[in-house]
Amino acid sequence: MTITAAMVKELRQKTGAGMLDCKKALEETNGDIEAAATLLREKGIAKAAKKADRIAAEGLTSVVVKGNEAVLFELNSETDFVAKNKQFTDLIEELGNLFIESNVASVEEALSLKGASGKTVEEVILGATATIGEKISLRRVVRVKKTDAQGFGAYKHMGGRISVLTVLESANEELAKDLAMHITVFNPQFLSRKDVNQSTIEVETKVISEQIANDESLQGKPEKILNGILQGRLNKVLQEIVLLDQGFVKDPSITVANYLKSANNNILSYVRLEVGEGIEKKVDDFAAEVMAQVNK
């Protein structure tokens, strides 16, 4: 397979590795960019690609809480110019108020929901698309419920670039919001170690094993020592991706688990939405993007 400059560029942006390393990795994986990124990690040339590296779609997220129910959702636009537009932010507020007063728990249910005007949300969004001049789309809707004894913590970062909701075993508004802020910053993939799926363990174990095998300073070491190194590195990875194992944002010397224990509380669940998370999108030249807006 022919390895193009565009493929090398994409892999460099994803991993931060050098041009030649990226080209070689692509050649070894027959042009498979994801496989090449993993190969670079195994060789210790690149760190794990983060989800943020792939965030390109624009728009806003929002979280709305009323009593024992909360709704989080994401509304996408094509550019951040539109996401900052008052008409777009007003639409976010309108949808949030409509969703929290209903029972919608999915995009499909939300799109068919009718507002005070008699129009469905889908019709309202199509109208906004026509008026604003960019495609507007509702991507995610999540509904969360709690009991009277439990507590919500909601936090919106940068006006809605990220929205987080936490659910605590016992109501504690300050604690719940602190945890929501922590989750905003550290973006844990799992709540506890028991939630970590086997595929994640297998991938990380393979990457670490290859790193150890390629480390000349570890050549000839006893298998027991190498296994200890592997487990130590795997444990460090888990500490980075598991919420309860992470150092607490306000006091990194203690884990989130210990912080909760000191407050005699537990976190039951959380939801974190970040604009464009996981969406692949062509990134245009900034100047060209500006001119595209001017010429509309």
Curated annotation (Swiss-Prot):
Q: Does the record bear Cytoplasm in its keywords?
A: yes
Q: Which CDD domains match?
A: UBA_EF-Ts
Record carries keyword Transmembrane helix: no
Give start-end ranges for the coiled-coil region(s).
Answer: none
A single GO molecular function term of this UniProt record? translation elongation factor activity
For this record, an example GO cellular component is: cytoplasm
Location of region: Involved in Mg(2+) ion dislocation from EF-Tu: 79-82
Where it sits in the cell: the answer is: Cytoplasm
Q: Cite the entry's keywords alphabetically.
A: Cytoplasm, Elongation factor, Protein biosynthesis
Q: Please describe what this protein does.
A: Associates with the EF-Tu.GDP complex and induces the exchange of GDP to GTP. It remains bound to the aminoacyl-tRNA.EF-Tu.GTP complex up to the GTP hydrolysis stage on the ribosome.
**Into which family does the record put it?**
Belongs to the EF-Ts family.
Name by which UniProt lists this protein:
Elongation factor Ts
Instruction: State the organism's lineage.
Output: Bacteria, Bacillati, Mycoplasmatota, Mollicutes, Acholeplasmatales
